[in-house]
Amino acid sequence: MPFMPCRGRERADPVVYIVDDDPDMNDALADLLDSAGMRSKSYVSADAFLSTPIGEEPSCLVLDVRLRGANGLDVQQELKRRGIALPIVFITGYGDIEMTVQAMKAGAVDFLAKPFRDQTFLDAVSQAIAVDRTKRRAVRCGDDLRARFATLTEREREVMTLAVAGLMNKQIAGEIGVSEVTVKIHRGRAMRKMSARTFADLVKMAIELDRAAPALHDRRDQSSAPRYAGGTTPQSMAASYG
């Protein structure tokens, strides 16, 4: 069974935000999405969209490049400035290669020139939703792991850090000045609290915690990087488990 660190579920069905200054185009795209079972919210200006809070559900943005009083590429940069990683499908009747390249380099999922086929549009939106779903799941899983790690005692964190670094129970006992039996107890408790079915799972969880915040499981100082014995890392340990 693959390693699945997260337990949370998505909060709602996906939503597609549509920003086009042509009301008829907005309505047509909304109807198309509705026919495919997708929810949508439409806006006729960049300002109207940018003043709207983005929900917690998986979502994407269908954005016209040339809006009245605004440039779709500028909207893309503004979202990035705000830290909003919303996948974007650009649509335009005036696209050129330079504009397409600029949008894609900035992270756009697709760039569609009007007129486009209905299925082409739906495929692009589905891909964008999938991208956002993956990102949100990664965040959710990271939050879940951090919450579990926070329940460990200082000693359990200490033992976990040394164990995933490759030290045997006897070595850990000598390192922290306790008996080997005590190490086994703390290691078992750490695995239960982390919901790790196997030690390999615990190693993979340590890798995920490292990626999110390396100092989370440093046993000496919460502000410094973790120390691993003999050059061993959680990544190399995980590789040995396949």
Region spans (language model):
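C-terminal output helix
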Residues: 96-98, 112, 116-126, 175
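Acidic, metal-coordinating helix/loop segments flanking the phosphotransfer/catalytic sites
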Residues: 42-60
